[in-house]
């Protein structure tokens, strides 16, 4: 099954980090599910991750990413190092190279986008979004970030609601996780 047209957003603000996603699953031109969960807490709830792409591929990548984080002998959680290591493997490994997904990973200090082309991007702003409605959610979130009264969770929720109004592959059944 393929999560075609997913919208996932990550935001950091005031010591809180949020990853949120819509719940729509489409297959071709058909909506198969409206309440899918596309985000996870990893490493005992210290890291949030969300994905756009094939479901089985995303689960594999979540597992590989968590392995990379936990592989440090000193026990330090370094999502930047783990993201780079995963991106290297994803790009060069014959099996992983075929996986079709994008990931957002975040902890209390970082937000990163990881792609199968080997990209690891840390956004300039404390917000990033992926998927078919990603640009809509990102634009809305940037505008909402100017309102200092809104929390990271408020901004993510409002931004995804706007994306759902514009993108036919995004719905307003939002799942949100927060750390910090």
From Swiss-Prot:
TM ranges: none
Enzyme kind, highest EC tier: hydrolase
Gene Ontology molecular function, alphabetical: metal ion binding; threonine-type endopeptidase activity
Record key words, sorted: Allosteric enzyme, Cytoplasm, Hydrolase, Metal-binding, Protease, Sodium, Threonine protease
Documented EC number(s): 3.4.25.2
GO BP annotations listed: proteolysis involved in protein catabolic process
Keyword Cytoplasm attributed: yes
Subcellular localization, as worded in the UniProt entry: Cytoplasm
Catalytic activity: ATP-dependent cleavage of peptide bonds with broad specificity
Record: residues binding Na(+): 164, 167, 170
Subunit relationships: A double ring-shaped homohexamer of HslV is capped on each side by a ring-shaped HslU homohexamer. The assembly of the HslU/HslV complex is dependent on binding of ATP.
Family, as annotated: Belongs to the peptidase T1B family. HslV subfamily.
Protein name: ATP-dependent protease subunit HslV
């Amino acid at each position: 099954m393929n999560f075609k047209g997913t919208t996932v957003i990550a935001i950091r603000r005031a010591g809180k980090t949020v990853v949120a996603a819509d719940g729509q699953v489409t297959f071709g031109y058909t909506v198969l599910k409206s309440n899918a969960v596309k985000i996870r807490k990893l490493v005992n709830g210290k890291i949030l991750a969300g994905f756009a792409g094939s479901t089985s591929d995303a689960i594999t990548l979540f597992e590989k990413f968590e392995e990379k984080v936990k592989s440090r002998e000193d026990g330090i959680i370094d999502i930047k190092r783990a993201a780079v290591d995963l991106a290297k493997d994803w790009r060069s490994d014959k099996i992983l190279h075929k996986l079709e997904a994008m990931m957002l990973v975040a902890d209390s200090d970082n937000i990163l986008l990881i792609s199968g082309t080997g990209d690891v991007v840390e956004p300039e702003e404390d917000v990033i979004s992926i998927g078919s409605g990603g640009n809509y959610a990102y634009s809305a979130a940037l505008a909402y970030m100017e309102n200092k009264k809104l929390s990271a969770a408020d901004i993510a929720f409002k931004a995804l609601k706007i994306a759902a109004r514009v993108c036919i592959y995004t719905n307003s059944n939002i799942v949100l996780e927060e750390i910090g």
